[in-house]
């Protein structure tokens, strides 16, 4: 600045900047100390400590008239309630496999009736026999609790107890021996079960003389189980896990009609035909014979004799070679 009346060239920016101004405090008397404010106690007029103590004692001694607000157990019961188990439909092969594998949790999730629990395979074995033979103690205990028949035997006359003793599973033997068995009523129960008629849904017949356990292992029942395959490709041993089969089913194939989008394709393979030797055009040929022989066709087992060919010696081969040389020489002479 040249003079006191002139302003700073950047006076506008200095006036608009948000500067914090310093405030100066004048010095005071050093001997003077300000008194700190004391905490003021709130006092209630007309009430002393003894009266207040007596009042609180009366309040505490008075009986309560309202019930305390306890947490409701209904809500906790709803929160702790386990979700309902979804039962899986009964599958005989899966039921036997789970019993031998000692998987009790999966067994309990399967919907099985009393007949399903006592079902047998083609050898007359029940799930209890299989579990006892494999030493599946938990599965045996679960089946016994469900009320399976312990004294049933297979076609060879072996019970679950005998199979466990033969395999050396002492835990299973002790479990089966500790069960209370009524020997007197066993014969009566067998006679009653044998006389009860039943209807087999697989065989579509009513049975009166044969009991249900024996009918399960009969040849007629086992044959009818395999009479109706799941689909037509079952006879070709194509598994349901086959990727090609899964793709066709996913695209809408019903596993019954022909192949292709229009379901008009050939389902079964083309029959093979024996190849015939073709001698030339215009010559009649025999009808092609299908390689699949019919029933009671003796040609299927007929032994065909091989064509006889005479044995050639070295002299015969030399003689044939000379004959061919003479024939070639004669043709050259004629053509020249």
From Swiss-Prot:
Start and end residues of each G-patch domain: 240-286
InterPro entries recorded: Ankyrin_rpt (IPR002110), Ankyrin_rpt-contain_sf (IPR036770), G_patch_dom (IPR000467), GPANK1 (IPR039146)
Listed name of the protein: G patch domain and ankyrin repeat-containing protein 1 homolog
Start-end of each ANK repeat: 123-152, 156-185
UniProtKB keywords: ANK repeat, Repeat
Organism of derivation: Drosophila melanogaster (Fruit fly)
Superkingdom, natural source: Eukaryota
GO molecular function: nucleic acid binding
Record-linked PANTHER family: BAT4 PROTEIN-RELATED, G PATCH DOMAIN AND ANKYRIN REPEAT-CONTAINING PROTEIN 1
Lineage, uppermost ranks: Eukaryota, Metazoa, Ecdysozoa, Arthropoda, Hexapoda
């Amino acid at each position: 600045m040249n003079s006191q009346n002139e302003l700073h060239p950047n006076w506008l920016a200095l006036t608009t900047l948000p500067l914090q101004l310093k405030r100066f405090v004048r010095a005071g008397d050093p001997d003077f100390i300000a008194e700190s404010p004391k905490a003021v106690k709130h006092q209630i007029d007309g009430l002393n400590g003894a009266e207040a103590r007596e009042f609180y004692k009366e309040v505490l001694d008075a009986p309560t008239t309202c019930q305390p607000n306890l947490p409701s157990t209904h809500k906790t019961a709803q929160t702790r309630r386990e979700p309902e188990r979804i039962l899986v439909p009964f599958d005989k092969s899966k039921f036997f496999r789970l019993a031998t594998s000692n998987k009790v949790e999966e067994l309990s999730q399967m919907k099985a009736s009393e007949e399903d629990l006592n079902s047998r395979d083609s050898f007359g074995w029940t799930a209890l026999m299989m579990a006892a033979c494999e030493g599946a103690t938990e599965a045996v205990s679960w089946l016994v609790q469900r009320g399976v028949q312990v004294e049933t035997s297979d076609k060879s006359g072996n019970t679950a107890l005998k199979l466990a003793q033969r395999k050396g599973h002492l835990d299973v033997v002790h479990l089966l021996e500790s069960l209370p068995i009524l020997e007197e009523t066993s014969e009566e129960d067998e006679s009653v079960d044998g006389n009860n008629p039943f209807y087999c849904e697989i065989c579509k017949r009513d049975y009166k003389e044969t009991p249900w356990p024996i009918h399960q292992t009969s040849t007629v029942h086992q044959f009818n189980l395999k009479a109706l395959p799941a689909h037509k490709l079952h006879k070709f041993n194509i598994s349901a896990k086959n990727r090609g089969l899964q793709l066709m089913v996913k695209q809408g194939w019903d596993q019954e009609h022909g192949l292709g989008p229009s379901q008009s394709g050939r389902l079964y393979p083309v029959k093979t035909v024996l190849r015939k030797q073709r001698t030339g055009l215009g010559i009649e040929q025999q009808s092609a014979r299908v390689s699949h022989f019919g029933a009671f066709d003796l040609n299927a087992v007929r032994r065909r004799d091989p064509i006889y060919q005479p044995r050639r010696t070295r002299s015969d081969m030399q003689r044939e070679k000379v004959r061919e040389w003479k024939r070639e020489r004669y043709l050259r002479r004629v053509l020249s």
